[in-house]
Amino acid sequence: MRVSSLTAPRWLLLLALSAAASAARAEPAVDPCGTFNSDVRHERALFAGQAQPLAAAKAAAGAPAVTPEHLYQLQLHQRAEVTFALPPAQRHPPPAAGYAGLVTLEVDAAGLYRVALDQAFWIDVVAKGVSIQSSDFEGRRGCAAPHKIVEFMLPANTPLTLQFSGGITPTLTLAVTRAPAAAAHH
């Protein structure tokens, strides 16, 4: 259609619609990592750093230790090769073809801690043969720094096993952090 064949109101309408469409495309997209309900600035800062490579274990015995405030890139195993300390408490059983692995953790002070991951994996924390229930969790599609954060009340000076299962990739980025004081009171 030629512009000269359009009446002035139609031409102006077409111009306005075109400008609106261009403006809509130019608006910055919402950062999915910025939409967590909790303050996750600390975890985001950790995820911006260099991850330490670490091979997760196939069983709790001999599982490598992780420490809070560090970023790890875990190398996982086929789920069928992993023997869990306890069966994963996932409501929907993960596919047998997925990936899994175990690490250990011990914290000096009891309190609320966050386990942050770069993708969707199920997390179990086991202490003395008993599963510690999570107290809260959040996840954001489109955000890998971090994608998922699960909070647990952890006991001090107690060997803990962190079990990861249900993922579809052979690697997983992990950080454990102390939850901010405000999060500990909700």
Language-model-derived ranges and their functions:
Residues 2-13:
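Bacterial N-terminal signal peptides that target proteins for export
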Residues 120-136:
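Short, surface-exposed beta-strand/strand-loop-strand elements in extracellular ectodomains
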Residues 27-97, 183-186:
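Non-catalytic extracellular/lumenal accessory regions of secreted precursors
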Residues 101-105, 143-157:
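Beta-sandwich interaction modules
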Residues 20-24:
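N-terminal signal peptide c-region/cleavage motif recognized by signal peptidases
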Residues 111-113, 152-168:
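Noncatalytic modules at the cell exterior or secretory-pathway interfaces
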Residues 107-119:
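A short beta-strand element within beta-rich, extracytoplasmic domains
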Residues 168-180:
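Edge beta-strands of jelly-roll/beta-sandwich modules across compartments, strongly enriched
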